[in-house]
């Protein structure tokens, strides 16, 4: 994004050895990039770390504060690219994985962003399979679609209730489970009369498969990043989760489907749009801007696309919760 913004060739970002044309940019003015502002106004660009870890992550790391802590922290920014930072005041490792747009409602038949009408939370009755949902918006708002946090809940609940198996296929029948002419299953959350659009709101096997791939990318990236410094999930003291996928993620459900490591739920903290918080900080404080440069200089980037073992870890993570159920003892107990 930074390359396109300042008009620099972005080709090196996607080609081996995946090194950006620049990491930081000083002295840029609004007039240089044709911003509708005072042409002499300074434009601050947060520094990149690697080809797929940009200024949004350095700004998010600043906001999360792991750079100033002794404890080991994991920072996760969920989006089309899942970006991670692990470390403390002594060191920081970063990487990025291609999660796709599922966390923001993309590649999901009834998916949408976390705006009015989005189903952002869901529970299912294990016996009747009846859903109870929470919808973004005013009281009485009918559902329009499902946002990222809602998708996490729905898939976790479908798996917990034995409605889908580890591959995300429907294995239990009921009034809410429908199948098309080809036998593909879907779970109906709201019928045509119950939705705000006059269309059925449901999640099907293709949607679930897309989301399993997205969560698999996140978990395998976490596992690879930790193993690169010879550490395990048990050594994580705090997990900061950022991203605009809803008003908050049900961390228990995210762990149950194998998206995050099975650590104590008290360690998780949802911090919303950390990139925006970091950008605000460097705009308002010269000291924060200096600290941002220090963060970038002290962060090591791990390129997952060329890292041995990452693809094997990804394939293993594309099940609910994982091919190795021993990694999720609490989730297995839940089921």
Tell me what each language-model feature is.
Residues 1-10, 183, 231, 243-262, ...:
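Short glycine/threonine-rich loop-to-helix capping motif typified by GTGT followed
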Residues 57-60, 212-234:
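Phosphate/ATP-binding catalytic cores across multiple sugar-kinase/actin-like superfamilies
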Residues 152-214:
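Gly/charged contiguous loops adjacent to phosphate- or pyrophosphate-bearing nucleotide/cofactor binding elements
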